């Protein structure tokens, strides 16, 4: 069973913020900032592409609601979302991170420095997509 399934079945404890038959939202155990939440389907879909459309719609409705609630509670400078698939999905269960951002929080994007210097290089890299 995945961590999310264990939380849904109450086999492990979590700070649950929202739950329906299809979606659960709970506090991340290793948060980037206060208010860092995970939103996931209650069933074990592994990747983004596996989630049925109606469940995905509900997930996005929950994300929108939680965005408003996080914004109201924490008054952040911004709110970020992250979602990983394949070997970068460390839970083996589709989930989306949502967390408040604050100036100076030191969370950032590290450039891979691919060397794309102009629009033509960028266009060529995406040909056939």
Predicted regions located by residue number:
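HIT superfamily nucleotide-processing domains
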Residues: 1-129
